[in-house]
Amino acid sequence: MIRNSTNTNNIMETEVALKDWILYYHKLCEVNSGEIFSGNEIITDFDDPVLSDPLLNLKPLPKNEVTVNKDNVIKDNDYSSNGCDFAKSKFHIKGLVGLLTTASVYIGLDNSTNPSYDISQACEFDLEDNTVQQGTGRSANMNPACKVAGFNKSSVRDTIFNIFKIPKKDEKISNDMEVNNTLSRDLDYKKDLFEFVRKYFGISEEETLIGHYTGWLLQEVLIQGNLFITNSSLVYLAHLPKLTDAVVLCGKLKLRSRLKGNPRYWCVLKHSTLALYNDPSDIYFPILSIDLNHVEEISLENSLKDENTMTFVLEASSKNYKFIAGSSHSAKTWVKCLKKQLFSIKNQSKDTIGIKFPISSIIDVECQSYMNQGQSIKVKCFDGNKNYALKEYTFLFFDKDGDSFYNIISNFIPRNMNPVEASLQNSNPTIHLNSKSHFNDKIKILSAVNIDDIICDTDSFEMTSSDILSDIDENIQPLSLKHVRDISNCKNYLKEDLKTSNKMTIQDCNKKVQTSEIQLITYSKHDSRMELNDDSKYYQGNIGNDNKGILSFKNICSIWNTSPIHNKDSDNFFMTSDPFVTSINDTTLAKIKDWFNLHDNEVLHALYYAYLIKGYPVYGKLYVTNRRLYFKSCIPGVNVKMVLPLEDIEGYNEILGTNYGNFGILLTVQNEKELQFGFNSCTNRSDFENVLQRCLDICKYAIKTPELVTSRVIESESEHSRLRFFEEKFSTEGIDIPFLVEDNPYFKTKIMPTKSYNFGFLTIGSRGDVQPYIALAKGLIQEGHSVTIITHREFKSFVECHGIDFKEIAGDPTKLMSLMVEHEAINVGMLMEASSKFRGWIHDLLVTTWEACKNLKLDILIESPSAMAGIHISEALQIPYFRAFTMPWTRTRAYPHAFIVPDQKRGGSFNYLTHVIFENVFWRGICSQVNKWRVQTLGLEKTNLAQLQQNKIPFLYNISPVIFPPAIDFDEWIKVTGYWFLDESESFEPSQELETFISKARKLGKKLVYIGFGSIVVNNAKEMTRAVIDSVLETDIFCILNKGWSERLGKEELRYEEEPEYPETIFLCDSIPHDWLFPKVDAAVHHGGSGTTGATLKAGTPVVIKPFFGDQFFFASRIEDIGAGIALKKLNVSSLSNAIKKVLTDKSIKRKAVSLKKRVAKENGVTTAINCIYSELEYARSLVVKKNHKSSNIEFIQHPNNVNDTTKTVIPLTSMV
């Protein structure tokens, strides 16, 4: 049965369409569909919103509308292209994954004669997490002892972090500091830091330093700081980090809405704003910007009732926002990052936070251990001026220094005790809470959201007393470390407590400061006085009320003729004689700041009324500040905002006005997009140009290295990722609280694992599949980890020459390639041979891969999904598992699967379905052998696509966001990191002939073009070679030719033909490192592989791509879409000559290639990938535990007719009617 509330007709139509598309996909593989699909049943789950939405929008395949051409792409019947194609591949599927897919379909033919086989076996769709499928059970002969044979689970090492303090090279630290003398540097920075503390707190010279430690103060966030013990005082000092424009966190979230349902947005958290976008590539037009200055509370929804909630709430002053994350792990990550950012926002005017109290006031100290290495130390002291009110401060230590700190403080306690204090201690016993209910009933906590709420200032340097705190926290109960996770659920107590607490005046603080014994100080470098600034009341009610700035239609005509407005208070930007200078009142400035979340250092210069042409004209106000351009619509019912950083503007031109704006201007921005504005007069436009140019000149001078566009929507800070990993490690121990690393002027904190991880990289295929892993391995080795690349024997020397360990596995894909070459057509003989050979091929691959991974005792496994075995091995070894690949492999509506690329865009439903079909067909071919291997070798139960949950696996795409922007429906664990480039140019020594050839081309002023298609197999290699030669002669260029296709000619009778003669303008070469060659040529013609395409983008080289198979069609279409080259459908003299001429002469293509070069050069794919591994590692580990837990609760049912079939739920088509 189907749990379904959808209209029956829609389901029937969808089912017919789905079956048509599946049959059509097999037509792509040139397999007789009648031999494979003979049943009338199908499996699906229409309750899955991600799956049902695109499927229910799918229409049946129109008859005679589309056909399959021999290039393995979908093609309209009316599409025509003149000329023959000499580069037509002899065998239509030659990519590695294409070969595996084709072979897997052939293997599936073995079951086609079974009457019980039906379409559901080739179309298993993933179910929701809470859905349990029934299926085949364990084999009767399964040996439980084989579960992890030869593997000791205790060998998996856990990781705790070291926090290193690296002294900063600064004159104020030590002028004569020796860089090589680490001990001297360490002593110098500690000495200078204590001198700063001495002056900061006014510590007398008579006090001597006993101990210096790094501790973390436990409040709503854990604040890293320095603890100093003198002979009379205990001091804590932390330098608060400043807000930056770096992306803290980004990803897909759903915003709960009553009117719109739960729309999905790309959310970016940075500085004081949480911005929501429709698409990661459309970053100038946020749909919603939430100013965190107005946010009062951040919490998980119903966290006590449901520990796995995926919803969290932002409570603002006038509106609440509910977000739905992709998983409970993701929701917790968002909450922690938001809380940390909110803490920084509320205290951004402060540089430091300090606590000082006499040693004599300490009456008790408690110590708890956690994770075998850390300590939580709670210090209790009293304030004699407030009836001996108790104070408690909890400090966390992530190293053994906690023992030393505890011993020193404990030694002071006996001397501090007297009868009065003893009686006080006995009357105020420590309460140890062991249950959540008791905890929630008794505990009241002090929120550390805003330090301004708990401190006050005086005129003197020693200005603040803990007496200020006593009215708030007098009844605070001791906080046990194990209850930290419930802090966020106790805010109601905090609010009640703050309402009933007495408010002290500045005068009261001044009277009591002289008798204080405890100090809590905040200090700003810019002002020695502290101020009680609370602007939240001023902005209350303004958030979300953008309609106040919307004008009625009757006012638009009059305002349209308004002259520009120049802000008089804009730092003398305009002359006083300027006729447009006007004073803008504070109320208007406050509204503008509220609308756009302006930074404190932004100054409004000018205001214009203009039209923004964004598909349709939008009338509104255009604001110019010293940092950005802002636009806000003024038409009722239209909500359009634009935020454009000035450094992104590359130029502007005057254009002919439209009907809506008689005088237009076109802005060209960094990502090659164009924004058009219309003004009512030439004067207004000229004034805007003058103001904009002045702002650009100032901005370009101040910002020498403009921020990368993609860095505004993708987190790239390594410390953020490491800190998230750090937080997740402690979250598993119950310390579910954000960590705040201090920004100390005397040293830089660096977080590194104390133990190295043992990584395994599993991949099969060609050199292009192995090379990116070498680059990533070298980056991880620099981090202190060990890496082993597990692949074919032929890459052993290539891997080991870079100092990386190598492990050999079977499964050489050249055996399948030779099988395809031997058979000129798909016939019965080929199917029989493929079936027998592929079974042995995949068996050897699975067995040798398991032996390699088991013997290596891996901690983390990263696999190219084409290797097939990694996901099962990680389950057997119970280790975190990542996937990494160079082509689209994740279900999305944004891109089709790389092996099912249509000639024209067919929409999100088609794109999504291509991934679903590919997954099912690929799994169909290998499921029987994989399940047999799981049972007999790994000791695991049989599985299917639903239970594998491949869409939940963390995925690293080693592709640049320039060519592959993250899709809006990508989950947080799917990362587009950038290319993993391996720099080989330094070690390459070109031949003298090659250097002479390049020099000759330059002296003659000829264009130099690279042409190479790799080792492809074509019908007539001789004709293709002649076409290339004739194209070179016709275009009058010099060509460096990598003629790999002539190594394996297509037809036997042509193999002994004479090689054509090459003119002097063609230089034949073998393999040359792309990073050395491509910067030296004017254009490149290649097959469109991921690595080759990335090399052309890195070099800024215009490109012509002639795809042959697999992902090459995808990258060809992407290059053409972004305007950096041409995708060639057919290769002959005419088409190739015209394409080469166009990329050499078209200035727009060259300009785009250069622009992309700058963007790719600023990316660091390896570093970003390592950061993603750190940030998603605990999530990957949780999947292993979750899968293991689920498998122990699943009841399997074995089908008697075919024990090798995968588990499935079969739904007859008739039941849908």
UniProtKB/Swiss-Prot annotation:
**EC number per UniProt:** 2.4.1.-, 2.4.1.173
Give every PH domain span.
246-343
Annotated GRAM domain ranges read: 195-232, 590-656
Q: Any idea which positions bind UDP-alpha-D-glucose? A: 766-767, 769, 1042, 1072, 1074, 1087, 1090-1092, 1111-1112
**Which molecular-function annotations from GO does this UniProt entry contain?**
sterol 3-beta-glucosyltransferase activity
InterPro entries the record matches = ATG26_PH_GRAM1, ATG26_PH_GRAM2, EryCIII-like_C, Glycosyltransferase_28, GlycoTrans_28_N, GRAM, PH-like_dom_sf, PH_domain
BP term (GO), one: carbohydrate metabolic process
Q: What does the UniProt keyword field contain?
A: Cytoplasm, Glycosyltransferase, Lipid biosynthesis, Lipid metabolism, Membrane, Repeat, Steroid biosynthesis, Steroid metabolism, Sterol biosynthesis, Sterol metabolism, Transferase
Instruction: Indicate how the chain sits in the lipid bilayer.
Output: Peripheral membrane protein
Coiled-coil ranges from the UniProt annotation: none
SUPFAM superfamilies in alphabetical order: PH domain-like, UDP-Glycosyltransferase/glycogen phosphorylase
Family recorded in the similarity comment: Belongs to the glycosyltransferase 28 family.
Record function comment: Sterol glycosyltransferase responsible for the glycosylation of ergosterol to form ergosterol-glucoside.
Q: What is this protein called?
A: Sterol 3-beta-glucosyltransferase
